Amino acid sequence: MELRKPVSQEEARAKTTAWALTFADLTTLLLTFFVLLLVILNDAESHVDRWVNVILDETEKELRVLQQSTLVDIERVTKGIKITLTGAKLFKSLSADLNPDADPILVQIGGLIRTSTLMNIYNQKRWAPLLDMIARAQDTLNIEIRCEGHTDDKPIPMNSKFRNNWELSSARSLNLVQRLSELAEMDEHYFSALGYGEFRPKIDLRNINDRVKLEEARAENRRVEIYFDAFIKSKNESLENI
């Protein structure tokens, strides 16, 4: 009968720990796979975001014609395209009712938004690959027209129907988006309204001592900003909001 060769402690230890080494290798490979998967997904997401920014840049150029009016300023910002309207031309003092004289510029803004590249990407073949990428990821492209109202720092009189500048700025932005939606003949689900009162001034008034310059700065702060933006909403975000 053949005698078994004695096994040293080192050999026995190596055999008993061999599975652990194999398991560690598999774990490392799985970790590497998931890291690569995350990199690929992030790269795809960045690619989509870059294309959305290209669309916004193109749309901003289309809206530049609005700057021919002294009432309007256009700026490309991180929150999309910002259209700034001077408050004094839109509303009377302490009123949230739109001046009828503002209708022509609102008609122009609404028309340009309605016919813009961003609002018509589903009708243009050149954006089909982008829309296909978004659909395959089960994401959605959200288009938003958000109005933000701002006032100056003067307190609201006691006899006003508004309790404070928050209420006044909110009422103004709401009236503006409702009117813009009507004139542009666009669905209301694109629009939203916010009011910031005097708390997000365009010009800081604290270091202005000259009365004339102070009133000029206050006039700059009385404004309405319309943000025309697009962003990708992931499937997971939609599920979280249910």
Predicted regions located by residue number:
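Extracytoplasmic beta-rich ectodomain segments of secreted or membrane-anchored proteins
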Residues: K61-T70, N99-N142
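Short terminal targeting/anchoring segments
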Residues: M1-T86
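Periplasmic OmpA-like peptidoglycan-binding domain that tethers envelope proteins to the cell wall
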Residues: P100, R126-I242
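Short, solvent-exposed beta-strand/turn patches at coil↔beta or beta↔helix junctions
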Residues: K79-N123, K154-R163
